[in-house]
UniProtKB/Swiss-Prot annotation:
HAMAP family: HisI. This is Phosphoribosyl-AMP cyclohydrolase. One of its GO terms (cellular component) is cytoplasm. Binds 1 Mg(2+) ion per subunit. Pathway: Amino-acid biosynthesis; L-histidine biosynthesis; L-histidine from 5-phospho-alpha-D-ribose 1-diphosphate: step 3/9. It catalyses: 1-(5-phospho-beta-D-ribosyl)-5'-AMP + H2O = 1-(5-phospho-beta-D-ribosyl)-5-[(5-phospho-beta-D-ribosylamino)methylideneamino]imidazole-4-carboxamide. The gene is hisI. Belongs to the PRA-CH family. Zn(2+) binds at C93, C111, C118. The keyword Hydrolase applies.
């Protein structure tokens, strides 16, 4: 069974209030996905999905994304073992963003750097210049061991 999404309505109230899921992909065929931990709500990552990735995620309850840099479908955690099991999928009011609540397997790390979250740095102002400060330097795994080329 292939999952096909209907074209979104041009009627704003239908997008906001109707029961049909009609995701609004951008001009590149992508939709933004925000990913949080299902247990503690921590923001883990932001990625993009094409229609195939979104359909696979809905059908399998395992997170799939579209890699813009590699130009292909990507099953999160396939290499590292940190698969994301989806417990809930939400969309925003105009259906142009997806929110996945996930449980991360393996090392409980989402970032390819080995950290739990891709959001491990704060942006701060020092001497009038924006700088990055690491707030989570704990590595759950060694990326050089997992992602050998």
């Amino acid at each position: 069974m292939n999952l096909v999404f209907n074209a979104p309505s041009t009627d704003k109230s239908e997008l906001e209030d109707a029961g049909d899921f009609t995701p609004r992909f951008d001009d590149r065929g992508l939709i933004t996905a925000i990913v949080t931990d299902a247990h503690d709500g921590e923001l883990l990552m932001v990625a993009h999905m094409n229609a195939e990735a979104l359909a696979l995620t809905i059908k399998t309850k395992t997170a799939h994304y579209y890699s813009r840099s590699r130009g292909k479908l990507w099953k999160k955690g396939e290499t590292s073992g940190n698969l994301q099991t989806v417990t809930e999928i939400r969309t925003d009011c105009d259906q142009d963003a997806i929110w996945l609540k996930v449980v991360v397997a393996g090392h409980d790390a989402t970032c390819h750097t080995g950290r739990r979250s891709c959001f491990y740095r704060t942006v701060e102002l020092e001497d009038g210049k924006p700088v990055l400060n690491v707030v989570d330097d704990h590595l759950h795994f060694d990326p050089s061991e997992i992602y050998r080329k």
